[in-house]
Amino acid sequence: MTDSTYDVARVRTYLQDLQTRIADALGALDGTPLATDAWQRGPAERLRGGGCTRILEGGRVFERAGIGFSDVAGDALPPSASAARPQLAGRGFEALGVSLVLHPRNPYCPTVHMNVRMLIATKPGEEPVFWFGGGMDLTPVYGFEDDARHFHQTCKDALDPFGVELYPRFKKWCDEYFFLKHRNEMRGIGGIFFDDFSEPGFERSFDMMQSVGDAFLQAYLPIVERRAELPYGERERDFQAYRRGRYVEFNLVFDRGTLFGLQSGGRTESILMSMPPVANWRYNWQPEPGSPEARLYSDFIVPRDWI
Protein backbone atom coordinates (compact mmCIF):
# COMPACT_ATOMS: atom_id res chain seq x y z
CA MET A 1 0.00 0.00 0.00
CA THR A 2 1.26 3.47 -0.81
CA ASP A 3 -0.80 5.28 1.82
CA SER A 4 -3.63 4.65 4.26
CA THR A 5 -5.49 7.97 3.84
CA TYR A 6 -8.87 7.55 2.20
CA ASP A 7 -12.34 9.12 2.14
CA VAL A 8 -15.14 6.58 2.40
CA ALA A 9 -17.85 9.27 2.29
CA ARG A 10 -16.76 10.43 -1.16
CA VAL A 11 -16.67 6.87 -2.46
CA ARG A 12 -20.13 6.20 -1.03
CA THR A 13 -21.60 9.34 -2.62
CA TYR A 14 -20.11 8.49 -5.99
CA LEU A 15 -21.40 4.91 -5.92
CA GLN A 16 -24.94 5.93 -4.97
CA ASP A 17 -24.98 8.50 -7.77
CA LEU A 18 -23.62 5.95 -10.26
CA GLN A 19 -26.38 3.50 -9.38
CA THR A 20 -29.02 6.19 -9.90
CA ARG A 21 -27.60 7.33 -13.24
CA ILE A 22 -27.43 3.81 -14.64
CA ALA A 23 -30.88 2.85 -13.34
CA ASP A 24 -32.42 5.98 -14.88
CA ALA A 25 -30.77 5.29 -18.25
CA LEU A 26 -31.89 1.65 -18.31
CA GLY A 27 -35.42 2.56 -17.29
CA ALA A 28 -35.62 5.14 -20.06
CA LEU A 29 -34.35 2.63 -22.63
CA ASP A 30 -36.73 -0.12 -21.53
CA GLY A 31 -39.74 2.09 -20.94
CA THR A 32 -40.17 0.65 -17.44
CA PRO A 33 -38.64 2.31 -14.37
CA LEU A 34 -36.52 0.09 -12.15
CA ALA A 35 -38.10 -0.67 -8.78
CA THR A 36 -36.26 0.41 -5.62
CA ASP A 37 -35.69 -1.93 -2.68
CA ALA A 38 -33.75 -0.29 0.17
CA TRP A 39 -32.54 -2.64 2.90
CA GLN A 40 -30.76 -2.48 6.24
CA ARG A 41 -29.06 -5.10 8.39
CA GLY A 42 -29.38 -5.04 12.17
CA PRO A 43 -26.38 -4.26 14.42
CA ALA A 44 -26.45 -7.78 15.90
CA GLU A 45 -26.19 -9.52 12.52
CA ARG A 46 -22.94 -10.99 11.22
CA LEU A 47 -22.84 -8.42 8.43
CA ARG A 48 -23.88 -4.87 9.35
CA GLY A 49 -24.90 -2.00 7.11
CA GLY A 50 -27.31 -1.65 4.24
CA GLY A 51 -27.87 -0.84 0.64
CA CYS A 52 -30.32 -0.41 -2.19
CA THR A 53 -31.29 -2.76 -5.01
CA ARG A 54 -32.71 -1.39 -8.27
CA ILE A 55 -34.46 -4.17 -10.15
CA LEU A 56 -36.47 -4.69 -13.34
CA GLU A 57 -38.04 -8.01 -14.27
CA GLY A 58 -40.13 -8.78 -17.33
CA GLY A 59 -39.30 -5.57 -19.17
CA ARG A 60 -39.52 -4.87 -22.89
CA VAL A 61 -35.74 -4.86 -23.42
CA PHE A 62 -34.48 -6.45 -20.22
CA GLU A 63 -35.82 -9.76 -19.01
CA ARG A 64 -33.97 -9.02 -15.78
CA ALA A 65 -31.85 -6.02 -14.84
CA GLY A 66 -30.39 -5.66 -11.36
CA ILE A 67 -28.15 -2.90 -10.00
CA GLY A 68 -27.12 -3.19 -6.37
CA PHE A 69 -25.43 -0.71 -4.06
CA SER A 70 -24.21 -1.94 -0.70
CA ASP A 71 -22.12 -0.58 2.17
CA VAL A 72 -21.52 -3.32 4.73
CA ALA A 73 -19.07 -4.09 7.52
CA GLY A 74 -18.05 -7.24 9.35
CA ASP A 75 -15.65 -8.47 11.99
CA ALA A 76 -13.57 -10.82 9.84
CA LEU A 77 -12.71 -10.79 6.14
CA PRO A 78 -14.11 -13.94 4.51
CA PRO A 79 -11.68 -16.28 2.70
CA SER A 80 -12.76 -15.07 -0.76
CA ALA A 81 -11.56 -11.54 0.05
CA SER A 82 -8.29 -12.43 1.74
CA ALA A 83 -7.11 -15.29 -0.50
CA ALA A 84 -4.58 -13.04 -2.24
CA ARG A 85 -3.58 -11.35 1.02
CA PRO A 86 -3.31 -13.98 3.76
CA GLN A 87 -1.83 -11.39 6.12
CA LEU A 88 -5.26 -9.68 6.19
CA ALA A 89 -7.22 -12.81 7.14
CA GLY A 90 -9.48 -12.22 10.11
CA ARG A 91 -9.35 -8.42 10.01
CA GLY A 92 -12.46 -6.32 10.36
CA PHE A 93 -13.64 -4.83 7.10
CA GLU A 94 -15.93 -2.42 5.32
CA ALA A 95 -16.97 -3.12 1.73
CA LEU A 96 -18.91 -0.76 -0.47
CA GLY A 97 -19.69 -1.04 -4.14
CA VAL A 98 -22.08 -1.09 -7.06
CA SER A 99 -22.65 -4.31 -8.98
CA LEU A 100 -24.96 -4.95 -11.92
CA VAL A 101 -25.95 -7.74 -14.25
CA LEU A 102 -28.30 -7.16 -17.17
CA HIS A 103 -30.02 -10.03 -19.00
CA PRO A 104 -31.70 -8.71 -22.17
CA ARG A 105 -34.70 -10.47 -23.67
CA ASN A 106 -33.38 -10.53 -27.25
CA PRO A 107 -30.73 -13.27 -27.75
CA TYR A 108 -28.80 -10.94 -30.03
CA CYS A 109 -28.30 -8.54 -27.11
CA PRO A 110 -25.41 -9.63 -24.88
CA THR A 111 -25.57 -10.04 -21.13
CA VAL A 112 -23.31 -7.61 -19.31
CA HIS A 113 -21.76 -7.38 -15.85
CA MET A 114 -20.15 -4.35 -14.21
CA ASN A 115 -18.80 -3.83 -10.72
CA VAL A 116 -16.84 -1.13 -8.91
CA ARG A 117 -15.99 -1.46 -5.24
CA MET A 118 -13.74 -0.45 -2.36
CA LEU A 119 -12.68 -2.57 0.61
CA ILE A 120 -11.02 -1.44 3.82
CA ALA A 121 -9.43 -3.94 6.21
CA THR A 122 -8.85 -2.80 9.79
CA LYS A 123 -7.01 -4.10 12.83
CA PRO A 124 -6.63 -2.33 16.20
CA GLY A 125 -3.23 -0.71 16.52
CA GLU A 126 -2.42 -0.94 12.81
CA GLU A 127 -2.98 1.30 9.80
CA PRO A 128 -6.08 0.42 7.74
CA VAL A 129 -5.48 -1.21 4.37
CA PHE A 130 -7.71 -0.22 1.46
CA TRP A 131 -8.03 -1.31 -2.14
CA PHE A 132 -10.31 -0.94 -5.14
CA GLY A 133 -11.66 -3.54 -7.52
CA GLY A 134 -14.07 -3.86 -10.39
CA GLY A 135 -14.41 -3.99 -14.14
CA MET A 136 -16.95 -4.90 -16.79
CA ASP A 137 -17.36 -7.83 -19.14
CA LEU A 138 -19.65 -8.79 -22.00
CA THR A 139 -21.27 -12.20 -22.54
CA PRO A 140 -22.89 -12.55 -25.97
CA VAL A 141 -25.07 -15.43 -27.09
CA TYR A 142 -24.53 -14.51 -30.74
CA GLY A 143 -21.31 -12.60 -31.32
CA PHE A 144 -20.81 -9.42 -33.35
CA GLU A 145 -17.27 -8.22 -33.93
CA ASP A 146 -18.18 -4.53 -34.00
CA ASP A 147 -19.88 -4.91 -30.60
CA ALA A 148 -16.79 -6.56 -29.15
CA ARG A 149 -14.48 -3.89 -30.56
CA HIS A 150 -16.68 -1.07 -29.28
CA PHE A 151 -16.89 -2.55 -25.79
CA HIS A 152 -13.15 -3.13 -25.51
CA GLN A 153 -12.26 0.26 -27.01
CA THR A 154 -14.47 2.02 -24.46
CA CYS A 155 -12.79 0.09 -21.66
CA LYS A 156 -9.36 1.05 -23.00
CA ASP A 157 -10.34 4.70 -23.31
CA ALA A 158 -11.45 4.71 -19.67
CA LEU A 159 -8.10 3.33 -18.48
CA ASP A 160 -5.56 5.00 -20.77
CA PRO A 161 -5.44 8.32 -18.82
CA PHE A 162 -4.13 6.32 -15.85
CA GLY A 163 -1.47 4.40 -17.77
CA VAL A 164 -1.49 2.72 -21.17
CA GLU A 165 -0.30 -0.47 -19.50
CA LEU A 166 -3.55 -0.88 -17.54
CA TYR A 167 -5.87 -2.00 -20.35
CA PRO A 168 -3.74 -4.96 -21.53
CA ARG A 169 -3.08 -5.91 -17.90
CA PHE A 170 -6.75 -5.74 -16.87
CA LYS A 171 -7.95 -7.32 -20.13
CA LYS A 172 -5.72 -10.35 -19.58
CA TRP A 173 -6.89 -10.55 -15.95
CA CYS A 174 -10.50 -10.51 -17.16
CA ASP A 175 -9.89 -13.28 -19.71
CA GLU A 176 -8.32 -15.43 -17.00
CA TYR A 177 -10.86 -14.62 -14.28
CA PHE A 178 -14.09 -15.17 -16.23
CA PHE A 179 -13.09 -18.69 -17.26
CA LEU A 180 -15.03 -21.87 -16.52
CA LYS A 181 -12.28 -24.32 -15.65
CA HIS A 182 -14.57 -27.35 -15.67
CA ARG A 183 -15.77 -26.43 -19.19
CA ASN A 184 -12.41 -25.14 -20.43
CA GLU A 185 -14.11 -22.12 -21.95
CA MET A 186 -14.41 -18.39 -21.36
CA ARG A 187 -17.69 -17.03 -20.04
CA GLY A 188 -17.84 -14.35 -22.71
CA ILE A 189 -15.63 -11.99 -24.71
CA GLY A 190 -14.14 -10.44 -21.60
CA GLY A 191 -13.51 -6.77 -20.97
CA ILE A 192 -11.51 -5.56 -17.98
CA PHE A 193 -11.12 -6.83 -14.43
CA PHE A 194 -9.00 -5.53 -11.56
CA ASP A 195 -8.72 -6.18 -7.84
CA ASP A 196 -6.40 -5.33 -4.95
CA PHE A 197 -5.67 -2.00 -6.68
CA SER A 198 -4.21 0.87 -4.67
CA GLU A 199 -0.75 1.32 -6.16
CA PRO A 200 -1.06 5.05 -7.02
CA GLY A 201 -2.65 5.97 -3.67
CA PHE A 202 -6.25 6.79 -2.83
CA GLU A 203 -6.94 9.78 -5.11
CA ARG A 204 -5.58 8.28 -8.31
CA SER A 205 -7.05 4.85 -7.59
CA PHE A 206 -10.46 6.37 -6.85
CA ASP A 207 -10.29 8.45 -10.05
CA MET A 208 -9.54 5.31 -12.05
CA MET A 209 -12.44 3.43 -10.47
CA GLN A 210 -14.77 6.34 -11.31
CA SER A 211 -13.56 6.36 -14.91
CA VAL A 212 -14.48 2.68 -15.22
CA GLY A 213 -17.90 3.19 -13.65
CA ASP A 214 -18.63 6.27 -15.76
CA ALA A 215 -17.69 4.43 -18.98
CA PHE A 216 -20.27 1.67 -18.53
CA LEU A 217 -23.26 3.27 -20.25
CA GLN A 218 -21.16 4.31 -23.25
CA ALA A 219 -19.71 0.80 -23.47
CA TYR A 220 -23.04 -1.02 -23.37
CA LEU A 221 -26.04 1.07 -24.42
CA PRO A 222 -25.02 1.51 -28.09
CA ILE A 223 -24.81 -2.28 -28.38
CA VAL A 224 -28.31 -2.74 -26.96
CA GLU A 225 -29.69 -0.02 -29.22
CA ARG A 226 -28.23 -1.85 -32.27
CA ARG A 227 -29.49 -5.31 -31.32
CA ALA A 228 -32.67 -5.04 -29.22
CA GLU A 229 -35.07 -5.00 -32.18
CA LEU A 230 -33.44 -7.73 -34.30
CA PRO A 231 -35.92 -10.53 -35.12
CA TYR A 232 -35.38 -13.88 -33.40
CA GLY A 233 -37.20 -17.16 -32.92
CA GLU A 234 -37.40 -20.23 -30.72
CA ARG A 235 -33.99 -21.52 -31.84
CA GLU A 236 -32.25 -18.37 -30.64
CA ARG A 237 -34.14 -18.32 -27.35
CA ASP A 238 -33.24 -21.98 -26.73
CA PHE A 239 -29.55 -21.28 -27.29
CA GLN A 240 -29.77 -18.19 -25.08
CA ALA A 241 -31.17 -20.30 -22.21
CA TYR A 242 -28.42 -22.89 -22.76
CA ARG A 243 -25.67 -20.27 -22.65
CA ARG A 244 -27.24 -18.69 -19.58
CA GLY A 245 -26.61 -22.01 -17.86
CA ARG A 246 -22.89 -21.28 -18.18
CA TYR A 247 -23.48 -17.93 -16.49
CA VAL A 248 -25.14 -19.68 -13.56
CA GLU A 249 -22.28 -22.16 -13.29
CA PHE A 250 -19.64 -19.44 -13.15
CA ASN A 251 -21.46 -17.25 -10.64
CA LEU A 252 -22.16 -20.06 -8.20
CA VAL A 253 -18.82 -21.87 -8.48
CA PHE A 254 -16.12 -19.26 -9.19
CA ASP A 255 -17.30 -15.67 -8.76
CA ARG A 256 -15.50 -13.97 -5.87
CA GLY A 257 -18.27 -11.42 -5.37
CA THR A 258 -20.93 -14.10 -4.99
CA LEU A 259 -18.72 -16.14 -2.67
CA PHE A 260 -17.82 -13.05 -0.64
CA GLY A 261 -21.48 -12.20 -0.16
CA LEU A 262 -22.52 -15.71 0.83
CA GLN A 263 -19.48 -16.33 3.08
CA SER A 264 -19.91 -13.02 4.90
CA GLY A 265 -23.62 -13.46 5.59
CA GLY A 266 -24.73 -11.03 2.89
CA ARG A 267 -28.25 -10.42 1.64
CA THR A 268 -29.13 -13.42 -0.50
CA GLU A 269 -31.71 -11.68 -2.71
CA SER A 270 -29.19 -9.00 -3.64
CA ILE A 271 -26.37 -11.49 -4.22
CA LEU A 272 -28.42 -13.77 -6.47
CA MET A 273 -30.12 -11.06 -8.53
CA SER A 274 -27.34 -11.75 -11.07
CA MET A 275 -28.96 -15.08 -11.95
CA PRO A 276 -30.74 -15.21 -15.32
CA PRO A 277 -34.53 -15.61 -15.17
CA VAL A 278 -34.46 -18.68 -17.44
CA ALA A 279 -31.61 -21.14 -18.04
CA ASN A 280 -31.32 -24.74 -19.15
CA TRP A 281 -28.80 -27.55 -19.49
CA ARG A 282 -28.57 -30.23 -22.19
CA TYR A 283 -26.60 -33.42 -21.93
CA ASN A 284 -23.46 -33.37 -24.11
CA TRP A 285 -24.95 -30.90 -26.58
CA GLN A 286 -22.78 -29.63 -29.46
CA PRO A 287 -23.65 -26.89 -31.95
CA GLU A 288 -24.01 -27.79 -35.62
CA PRO A 289 -20.70 -27.17 -37.44
CA GLY A 290 -20.73 -23.91 -39.37
CA SER A 291 -23.78 -22.58 -37.54
CA PRO A 292 -24.01 -19.16 -35.85
CA GLU A 293 -24.05 -21.03 -32.53
CA ALA A 294 -20.77 -22.79 -33.40
CA ARG A 295 -19.20 -19.46 -34.33
CA LEU A 296 -19.65 -18.24 -30.76
CA TYR A 297 -17.25 -20.97 -29.63
CA SER A 298 -14.72 -20.65 -32.45
CA ASP A 299 -14.57 -16.87 -32.87
CA PHE A 300 -15.74 -15.18 -29.68
CA ILE A 301 -15.34 -17.01 -26.37
CA VAL A 302 -11.63 -17.49 -26.94
CA PRO A 303 -8.77 -15.19 -25.85
CA ARG A 304 -8.52 -12.55 -28.56
CA ASP A 305 -7.19 -9.03 -29.05
CA TRP A 306 -10.23 -7.04 -30.06
CA ILE A 307 -8.50 -3.70 -30.65
From Swiss-Prot:
Residues given in the record as substrate binding sites: S99, N115, V116, R117, G265, G266, R267
Q: Where in the cell is it found?
A: Cytoplasm
Marked site positions, Important for dimerization: H182
Which pathway, metabolic or otherwise, does it act in? Porphyrin-containing compound metabolism; protoporphyrin-IX biosynthesis; protoporphyrinogen-IX from coproporphyrinogen-III (O2 route): step 1/1
GO molecular function terms listed in the Swiss-Prot or TrEMBL record: coproporphyrinogen oxidase activity; metal ion binding; protein homodimerization activity
Which superkingdom? Answer: Bacteria
Catalytic residues of the enzyme: H113 (proton donor)
Q: What is catalysed by this protein?
A: coproporphyrinogen III + O2 + 2 H(+) = protoporphyrinogen IX + 2 CO2 + 2 H2O
Which cofactors are named for this entry?
Answer: a divalent metal cation
Q: Which residues bind a divalent metal cation?
A: H103, H113, H152, H182
GO CC annotation terms, alphabetical: cytoplasm
GO BP annotations of the record are: protoporphyrinogen IX biosynthetic process
Q: Which InterPro entries match?
A: Coprogen_oxidase_aer, Coprogen_oxidase_aer_sf, Coprogen_oxidase_CS
Kindly state which keywords UniProt assigns to this record, in alphabetical order: Cytoplasm, Heme biosynthesis, Metal-binding, Oxidoreductase, Porphyrin biosynthesis
Extract the ranges annotated as region (Important for dimerization): 247-282
- Name the Enzyme Commission number(s) assigned to this protein: 1.3.3.3
Q: Spell out the family assignment given in the record's similarity comment.
A: Belongs to the aerobic coproporphyrinogen-III oxidase family.
Q: What exactly does this protein do?
A: Involved in the heme biosynthesis. Catalyzes the aerobic oxidative decarboxylation of propionate groups of rings A and B of coproporphyrinogen-III to yield the vinyl groups in protoporphyrinogen-IX.
How it assembles, according to the record, is:
Homodimer.
This protein is called Oxygen-dependent coproporphyrinogen-III oxidase
Organism encoding this protein: Burkholderia lata (strain ATCC 17760 / DSM 23089 / LMG 22485 / NCIMB 9086 / R18194 / 383)
| The encoding gene | hemF
